[in-house]
A protein has these predicted regions:
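Acidic/histidine-enriched segments that form metal/cofactor-coordinating
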Residues: 2, 86-128
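His/Glu-rich zincin catalytic helix
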Residues: 1-83, 88, 104-107, 117
């Protein structure tokens, strides 16, 4: 049985390696940070857009606007978005903070083109 009254030993890490992202500016002027971390066959794409709580005119406006992105686009209704992401083993996280709204896509590398199509539609063609 574990004795919870005994404090565990504190171990200092031998070496802490912090990987720096590669910073690129796309032809359209959008900054891109690329971090190749690990051998996993998963890609994470984070989109940061100005539009957090500091820019909202009504309480919760930034949060609800961001969350509505998955509710439908010109090409896909909410059920089709969920179905396509689920089929390809991908998922979305939608959130907002003080300054920014975040859209994060996790996708298996082999299905990235298909899931990027859904992400593009969500960001460029929302219907709410």
């Amino acid at each position: 049985m574990l004795n919870r009254s005994d404090q565990p030993r504190i171990l200092e890490p031998e070496q802490l390696v912090v990987q720096r992202p590669e910073r690129i500016k796309l032809p359209n002027g959008v900054p891109l940070s690329v971090l190749n971390a690990g051998d996993n066959e998963v890609t994470r794409i984070d989109l940061l857009m100005a539009g957090g709580r500091w820019q909202q005119k009504q309480p919760l406006q930034a949060l609800f606007t961001n969350r509505m992105l998955r509710e439908g686009t010109r090409r896909y209704d909410a059920a089709r978005i969920a179905e396509k992401l689920d089929y390809y083993g991908a998922w979305l996280e939608l959130s907002s903070a003080s300054e920014y709204a975040y859209v994060t896509l996790y996708s298996l590398n082999k299905y990235l083109p298909q899931t990027l199509d859904v992400l593009e539609s969500i960001v460029k063609e929302p219907v709410f």
